[in-house]
Amino acid sequence: MAIERTLSIIKPDATRRNLTGKINAKFEDAGLRIVAQKRIHLSLAQAQKFYGVHKDRPFFGELTEFMASEPVVVQVLEGEGAIAKNREVMGATNPANADEGTIRKEFALSVGENSVHGSDAPETAAEEIAFFFSGLELVG
């Protein structure tokens, strides 16, 4: 399996509860390396641009307002099959359907406040990483 990079966002519900360290421990325990990380507070316009692919979905307004409500931690994870591994560690979008031991099962408050975001494909990962990080910020 190839070494990949993927974007991870620790969402406001998790940063508000100081869960960044616990969430990152789960990524690292799964063999993923954090090669870039920063804590930021998205503006509503930035959240709308980042989630623009969902602009016609009924949850778009609620999602973007939530993502701009408080700070988030954006980071790049690297490892073998990082995209799939990250999604496995995160668990199902709905925490009620997430497997035991996953981030969402353990920390999510609801489908909307589900603690983490992760890229779903190599193309998406590249776009999402470039949205938040320059090449100089990626330290492998």
Swiss-Prot record:
Q: What class of enzyme is it?
A: transferase
Name the gene for this chain: ndk
Keywords, alphabetical: ATP-binding, Cytoplasm, Kinase, Magnesium, Metal-binding, Nucleotide metabolism, Nucleotide-binding, Phosphoprotein, Transferase
What Gene Ontology cellular component terms go with this record?
cytoplasm
* Claim: Phosphoprotein is one of the keywords in the record: yes
Q: Which family does it belong to?
A: Belongs to the NDK family.
> What is known about what this protein does?
Major role in the synthesis of nucleoside triphosphates other than ATP. The ATP gamma phosphate is transferred to the NDP beta phosphate via a ping-pong mechanism, using a phosphorylated active-site intermediate.
> Quick one: a GO biological-process term for this protein?
GTP biosynthetic process
Which residues are ATP-binding? K11, F59, R87, T93, R104, N114
Q: How does it assemble?
A: Homotetramer.
Which EC number(s) does the record attach to this protein? 2.7.4.6
Q: Name one GO molecular function term.
A: ATP binding
SMART domains xref list = NDK
Question: Source taxonomy lineage?
Answer: Bacteria, Pseudomonadati, Pseudomonadota, Alphaproteobacteria, Rhodobacterales
Cofactors: Mg(2+)
Instruction: Output the PROSITE patterns linked to this UniProt entry.
Output: NDPK, NDPK_LIKE
Pfam families in UniProt: NDK
- List the source organism: Cereibacter sphaeroides (strain ATCC 17025 / ATH 2.4.3) (Rhodobacter sphaeroides)
Catalytic machinery residues: H117 (pros-phosphohistidine intermediate)
Q: Write down what this protein is called.
A: Nucleoside diphosphate kinase
The UniProt catalytic activity note for this protein reads: a 2'-deoxyribonucleoside 5'-diphosphate + ATP = a 2'-deoxyribonucleoside 5'-triphosphate + ADP; a ribonucleoside 5'-diphosphate + ATP = a ribonucleoside 5'-triphosphate + ADP
Q: Where in the cell is it found?
A: Cytoplasm
